[in-house]
C-alpha cells in the first residue's frame, strides 16, 4: 500500500465507496483536472457501516450493476481506504534503524511502543527527518482485513484494483494543483461528509496528523431525493437550524485539533495558518460560512471552476 502525493495514469478509474454512496470518476488529464466520465449510485442503509462492508453479496450485486451501467468492466481501479479505518501519525524510531529495516521494526513494535486501533495493519512509511538522537517517520496504517475485503469485492465484480489511496492525499493533490497552495502554510484540510468529518494537517505537503470526527445525529434523519435514475441529493427531514446547532460538537472537536497541533505537535512553535473545507455534505455552504465567522484563519474551499469536464456530464455530485 503506497501512498504518494502525485497519482498515476489518467486511464485508471477512481472509485469511492462510502456508507451511503458509490462514486467513480475518470480523468482525461490531471493538471488541470478534466473529468471525462463520472457517476454515482446511492446505497441502501446498512450495506456499509463505518467503512466496513456489512453486506458483501448485496454490495457486490450493486457494484456489478454500476460497472455495467458505467461501462468500466475489467478496468484498472484506484480506490479509497475508508477514513474510519485509517491512521496517519508521526513516529520516532531509533536512529540506528536502517531505512530498509524500518518496516520490520514497526511490525515488531506494534502493540508495544506503537499502538493502533486495529491489530493487523497494512502500512506505508515516509522518512521525515533524521536527528542526532532519532529518525522521524510518517506512518500511514490501515486495517488490513478491511482493505483486503474491498480489493476482493472489486475483483469479484470484474475490476482490477491496482492502488489504494486515501482521501486526505487525494484532496490535497487537488488543492496543490489548484494554485492556492502556499509552501509556508500549516494547512488544516477538512472534509465534511454526511456522517463524518476528516480533519488532516499538512506541513510541507505531508499529512502529519489526521482525526476522524463523528457528526452528532442519526443517518436515518436523511433521505434520498432522486434527481433521475442515476443520482440524487440527500435531504434532511428534521429542522435544518436544529441540525446546524448540533454541529457545535463538531466545531469543538475541530478546535481541539487546532490546539493539539499548536501545543502538542509543534510545541507552540507553529499554528494552523489556513483552513480548506470540502466534502459532500448537503449543508456545506452553511458550514463554510459558519467556519469563516468562527476562526481567525483564512477559511476557503477548492474553486469549483478549477475542475472541468469534456462534455455535459449527467452527474450532480458536489465533487463534479
Residues of each region from the PLM?
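Phosphate-interacting basic helix/loop segments used at nucleotide- and nucleic-acid interfaces
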Residues: 58-70, 175, 182-185, 261
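Short glycine-rich phosphate-binding loop at a beta-alpha junction
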Residues: 72-84, 154, 163, 265-280
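Adenine-nucleotide phosphate-binding core of ATP-dependent small-molecule kinases
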Residues: 216-272, 280-282
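Glycine-rich phosphate-binding/hydrolytic loop that grips phosphoryl groups
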Residues: 300-320
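Small-residue (GG/TT-enriched) beta-loop-alpha framework at ligand/catalytic clefts
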Residues: 13-14, 19-37, 79, 131-239
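Active-site neighborhood for divalent-cation/phosphate handling
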Residues: 76, 80-178, 304-308
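Non-catalytic, solvent-exposed interaction/assembly segments
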Residues: 1-109, 133, 148-151, 158
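Glycine-rich phosphate-binding loops at beta-strand->alpha-helix junctions
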Residues: 269-297
Amino acid at each position: 500500500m503506497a501512498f504518494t502525493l502525485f497519482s498515476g495514469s489518467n486511464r485508471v478509474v477512481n472509485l469511492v465507496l462510502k456508507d451511503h454512496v458509490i462514486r467513480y470518476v475518470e480523468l482525461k488529464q490531471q493538471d488541470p483536472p478534466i473529468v471525462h466520465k463520472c457517476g454515482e449510485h446511492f446505497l441502501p442503509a446498512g450495506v456499509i457501516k463505518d467503512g466496513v462492508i456489512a453486506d458483501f453479496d448485496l454490495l457486490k450485486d450493486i457494484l456489478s450493476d454500476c460497472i455495467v451501467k458505467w461501462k468500466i468492466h475489467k478496468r484498472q481501479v484506484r480506490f479509497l481506504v475508508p477514513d474510519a479505518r485509517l491512521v496517519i501519525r508521526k513516529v520516532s524510531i531509533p536512529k540506528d534503524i536502517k531505512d530498509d529495516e524500518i518496516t520490520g521494526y514497526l511490525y515488531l513494535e506494534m502493540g508495544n511502543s506503537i499502538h493502533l486501533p486495529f491489530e493487523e495493519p497494512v502500512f506505508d512509511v515516509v522518512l521525515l527527518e533524521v536527528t542526532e538522537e532519532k529518525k522521524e517517520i510518517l506512518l500511514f496504517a490501515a486495517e488490513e482485513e478491511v482493505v483486503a475485503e474491498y480489493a476482493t469485492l472489486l475483483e469479484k465484480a470484474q475490476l482490477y484494483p491496482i492502488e489504494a489511496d486515501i482521501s486526505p492525499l487525494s484532496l490535497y493533490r487537488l488543492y496543490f494543483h489548484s494554485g492556492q497552495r502556499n509552501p509556508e502554510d500549516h494547512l488544516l484540510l477538512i472534509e465534511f461528509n454526511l456522517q463524518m468529518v476528516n480533519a488532516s494537517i499538512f506541513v510541507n505537503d505531508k499529512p502529519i496528523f489526521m482525526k476522524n470526527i463523528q457528526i452528532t445525529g442519526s443517518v436515518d434523519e436523511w433521505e434520498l431525493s432522486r434527481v433521475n435514475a442515476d443520482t440524487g441529493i440527500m435531504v434532511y427531514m428534521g429542522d435544518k437550524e436544529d441540525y446546524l446547532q448540533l454541529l457545535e460538537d463538531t466545531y469543538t472537536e475541530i478546535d481541539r485539533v487546532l490546539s493539539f497541533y499548536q501545543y502538542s505537535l509543534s510545541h507552540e512553535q507553529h499554528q494552523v495558518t489556513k483552513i480548506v473545507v470540502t466534502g459532500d455534505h448537503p449543508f456545506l455552504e452553511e458550514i463554510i460560512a459558519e467556519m469563516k465567522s468562527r476562526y481567525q484563519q483564512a477559511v476557503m474551499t477548492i474553486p469549483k471552476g478549477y475542475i472541468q469536464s469534456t462534455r455535459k456530464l449527467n452527474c450532480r455530485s458536489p465533487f463534479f
